[in-house]
Amino acid sequence: MVRGMRTIPPMRSESLAFLRTLLDTPSPSGFERDGQRKWLEYVRANGATRTWNDAYGNCFAELAPTVAPAAGAAPFTVAVCGHADEIGLMVNHVDSNGFVYCRQIGGIDPASIVGKRLQFRSSVPGVTQPVIGLIGATAIHLQDRSGEPKVRKLHELFVDIGAKDEAAARARLNIGDPGTFLDASMMLTDDIIVARALDNRIGTWVAAETLRLCAQQAERRVRVVAVSTVQEEVGLHGAEMIAESLRPDVALVTDVGHATDSPGITQAQHGQFKMGNGPKIAIGGAMQPEVVARLLATADRLSIPLQRGATPGSSGTDTDAIFLAGGGIPCGLVSLPIRYMHTTVEMGALSDLERIPQVYAGFCEGLTGGERFAPTL
């Protein structure tokens, strides 16, 4: 393996194996079951005192405080959240020649998926293995090049599963079957990882790793609940559900953010964020200022660099749903800077990623359980 520019010890092998298991388990929005099962297995083996899930598959792992709250008082609850789902496609139509047409699950640039391989989870009785297909591309020799190049829309792209006709295709796939891109995770260097679903399997990984680190603390006065939410890519739906049911005192959310250090990105417009220079902390908008200040202080105490990101409005993450619940839940958002978001080659640095649960665990350890995150007016 090519050596990168890692300045901290290598990631714990069990943690890296768990991350790659999450990354390589198909979990499109609305069909997160397989990935959620892997997540629950890990948290149950790494400190959770209780786990549960709701009707839509949001998963929770609780770690009770080591110091009980005062008699009759409910424990101060910190929710550490990330969404489990990824973008993908859903079977929408099968034509007479057996070609499959799809609708998108989440935000997809059609130009980025031509020629890509897919795996569909079939609901046809008796079909137990993934159905493999590819998004067909007309050979360059056969293209009409007389006018301007045509940018094809998603509904114009077809998936070829090797079926000879409509009946053969429908014997293997039903309308509504979900598909994900067939791209496994890989290490580009000893620090740089590439995967189709860093967005946002890294968020659920952070939640589980924070729980694991907190379980090792000698004393902790707060209840920590790691949460793996569903359906973020199609509307933050899981976050709305868990905010209403859990009502934490504080929520720490992790998602991916844009690294702006690759060609073609205007930093004056999008900010300056470099992969490998530390996680990105959001400032403004849904982020509660006292929570942000404590996260920054915790990172400083632990000598962990954070890149500040201006977020005056929507963050485009689960934070936007959680902070509105229950009259306002104080939130913080720390993201992993990645390149090539919403493609099959999302790229990030492990050295950035593993610092996020370290900050969160330090944040939880420093709480007394009596905090009230609100401005002094």
Show the residue positions of the predicted features.
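N-terminal hydrophobic/helix-forming segments and targeting peptides
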Residues: M1-L377
